Amino acid sequence: MSLNLDEKKAVVAEVSAQVAKAQAIIIAEYRGLGVGHMTQLRAKARQSGIYFRVLKNSLARRAVSDTPFSGLSEHMVGPLAYGIGSDPVAAAKVLHEFSKGNDKLVIKAGAMANHVISSSEIASLASLPSREELLAKLLGTMQAPVANFVRTLNEVPARFVRGLAAVRDQKESA
């Protein structure tokens, strides 16, 4: 299905808006991937907050021109799907996990902040913990000293109460 000029401009504007908010873009070749598998991939991407779309490469080049992701233009060859996300790890995880289970999806390249990354670097990125997991670990690390301090403060009166209880028990038994 060919798009007229106004539709092409609308697609470029929509994708450009997503690219402006993005931290990472990952491109993958989907040659031979069935509709059912592509629908599953889209659903997983949507759940992870990833904008996932199949685009004409010429429109994608226009959308990323004059952005930190313009280096991806040289990799935009063949039937490609674009995963655009504000969390680089989430985008890498979704596409990498799906490509492990389906050999028809081949990750070609990606980009983060003026840096084009290879498919092996995307695999490494996918093995990192997600943003939420890192924030949870950070919060736990920050709360640990405070929690230990509170336990220490609570131990002083608790020890006093246990001492009084021991004295009471000793006097009652005597």
UniProtKB/Swiss-Prot annotation:
Cellular component aspect of the GO annotation: ribonucleoprotein complex; ribosome
SUPFAM superfamilies (alphabetical): Ribosomal protein L10-like (SSF160369)
Entry keyword annotation includes Ribosomal protein: yes
Chain segments annotated as coiled-coil in the UniProt record: none
InterPro entries, per database record: Ribosomal_uL10, Ribosomal_uL10-like_sf, Ribosomal_uL10_bac, Ribosomal_uL10_bac_type
A single GO molecular function term of this UniProt record: large ribosomal subunit rRNA binding
Name of the protein in question: Large ribosomal subunit protein uL10
